[in-house]
Amino acid sequence: MEKSWFNFMFSKGELEYRGELSKAMDSFAPGEKTTISQDRFIYDMDKNFYGWDERSSYSSSYSNNVDLLVSSKDIRNFISDDTFFVRDSNKNSYSIFFDKKKKIFEIDNDFSDLEKFFYSYCSSSYLNNRSKGDNDLHYDPYIKDTKYNCTNHINSCIDSYFRSYICIDNNFLIDSNNFNESYIYNFICSESGKIRESKNYKIRTNRNRSNLISSKDFDITQNYNQLWIQCDNCYGLMYKKVKMNVCEQCGHYLKMSSSERIELLIDPGTWNPMDEDMVSADPIKFHSKEEPYKNRIDSAQKTTGLTDAVQTGTGQLNGIPVALGVMDFRFMGGSMGSVVGEKITRLIEYATNQCLPLILVCSSGGARMQEGSLSLMQMAKISSVLCDYQSSKKLFYISILTSPTTGGVTASFGMLGDIIIAEPYAYIAFAGKRVIEQTLKKAVPEGSQAAESLLRKGLLDAIVPRNLLKGVLSELFQLHAFFPLNTN
C-alpha cells in the first residue's frame, strides 16, 4: 500500500502542501525526494499558494483552498488507494485511507506504530531546511498521538474528496464547521438516515467504527426533503419546484409522482379527480409466501397516499378542458390491475361523452401478476373504448410515455395515441432487457430501448422535454380545434 504524507493548514485560509512520498512506509528515509515536481506547487514566504498551472492570486476562503488542491481533473493524480497522513490546524495528526474500488473512506487516530517514523522524518533535513522562525506557524517537528475529535475535519475531507471525485459544483460546498450543513453529508445520506448502499460508501473511524449520522442530523435533512430532490444518477441536489425533477448537473430525468405530473400539466384550481374511492378487492385471492397481495396494496397506499397506480380526472391545460390519466410508478411499479383498467376505461368513456381531448401519461411495469388474467383483460378493454373514442367519435388522444413504460401498457393504450410523445431518455419496451437476453440468448444493444432509438425507428412522434411539454400539448390541441374556454 502506498503511503503519502501531507500537512493541511486550514486556519486563516492558509494551506500548505509538503509533498507525497511514493514508496512503502518501511522504505522511507529522511531526506528522500518527493515525487511531486516543484513546478506544480509554489509556496512563497508570504503564504501565497499557487498550483495546477494557475498562477493567479490565491483566495483566503476555505472552499477555494479545497478547489485548488483537489480539482476534478487532478484528483486521480494523488488519490489512488492511498493512505494520507494528515495534520490539522491544531497540529493533531491522523491518517485517511481511500479505497476507490471498495468505496472505503477510513480515518485512524492511532499512530503508535508510526510515531517513530514521523519523528525521524520531521527531524530530517527536508523539514529543517525550512524556516523555523517564530512567524512560521506551520513548523512542528513533533507529531503526537492525541485523542482529537476530528468530526469537523472529517467532514471537510469528505467534502473535498467526494466533490472532486464526482465533479460536484463548487457552489454547493459550504464553508462551515457544522457537520450538519455539509452538502456532501446530505447527498451521501439517504432519506432513511443510512449511508447510501447503492454506492456502498463506508464512512467510519477506527476509534468507534460507527457512522457519522445522528438522529438530530437526520431530522435536519428530513425538514427539507419536500423542497429538494436527489439525483439518482450523479447524486446532486436540485430544487423540486424549479427543476421539474430534471438534474441540472447531468441532465438526468428523475421519476415524478402522479400528483407532480398533474401539477405540471393542469392549471391551478381546475383539477377534478374521478373514482378516487375505487380499490382492489384481491379478485383471485392471490397467495404469496413473501407478502400477501392485500398487504402489498395497503403498504403502497400508505406510502403513496393513492388508492391504486393511476389518478384520473378532468382539468384545464392553458384554459383547454382535458381528460387526464396519470400512472404512478411508486404504486407497485405502476402495474395495471383491474382498478387501473377500470379507472382508465371510465375516464375514456367520460371524455367520449363530453367530447374532451384525452391525455394518458404512462409509467408502468406492465400487467399486475397478482390479478392474473383479469389484469390482461384490461389491455383489451381499454383498447376497445379507445377505438370508439378515436374512430367513431373522431376525438384526439395523446399518449405520453415516461420512464419506464413496459409490458402490457406498451402493448395496449401506450402505443395507441394519435400523437405519441416520450420524455428524453425514457426506457420504453415490451419485454425488459434481461428477459430478452435470457430468452433469446443474445445481447440487447445498449440504448436500443431508449426513446431516442424508438424515435429514429418511427415508433414515436416526438421527444419533448418536461419544461416544454405543457406548451406543446396546448399547441397540439388548438391545432385540432380544441381551444381555451372563453373566460369573459
UniProtKB/Swiss-Prot annotation:
GO cellular component: acetyl-CoA carboxylase complex; chloroplast membrane; chloroplast stroma
GO process annotations (BP): fatty acid biosynthetic process; malonyl-CoA biosynthetic process
Tissue expr: Accumulates in fatty acids synthesizing tissues such as embryos, expanding leaves, flower buds, flowers, and developing siliques.
Coarse class of the protein's main subcellular location: plastid
Residues annotated for Zn(2+) binding in this entry: C231, C234, C247, C250
Top-level division of the source organism's lineage: Eukaryota
Membrane topology, as annotated: Peripheral membrane protein
InterPro entries found in the cross-reference section: AcCoA_carboxyl_beta (IPR034733), Acetyl_CoA_COase_Trfase_b_su (IPR000438), ClpP/crotonase-like_dom_sf (IPR029045), COA_CT_N (IPR011762)
Cofactor binding, note field: Binds 1 zinc ion per subunit.
Cofactor entry: Zn(2+)
Molecular-function GO term, any one: zinc ion binding
Chain intervals annotated as zinc finger (C4-type): 231-250
Role, per record: Component of the acetyl coenzyme A carboxylase (ACC) complex. Biotin carboxylase (BC) catalyzes the carboxylation of biotin on its carrier protein (BCCP) and then the CO(2) group is transferred by the transcarboxylase to acetyl-CoA to form malonyl-CoA.
Similarity annotation: Belongs to the AccD/PCCB family.
Subunit structure: Acetyl-CoA carboxylase is a heterohexamer composed of biotin carboxyl carrier protein, biotin carboxylase and 2 subunits each of ACCase subunit alpha and ACCase plastid-coded subunit beta (accD).
Annotated protein name in UniProt: Acetyl-coenzyme A carboxylase carboxyl transferase subunit beta, chloroplastic
Protein species of origin: Arabidopsis thaliana
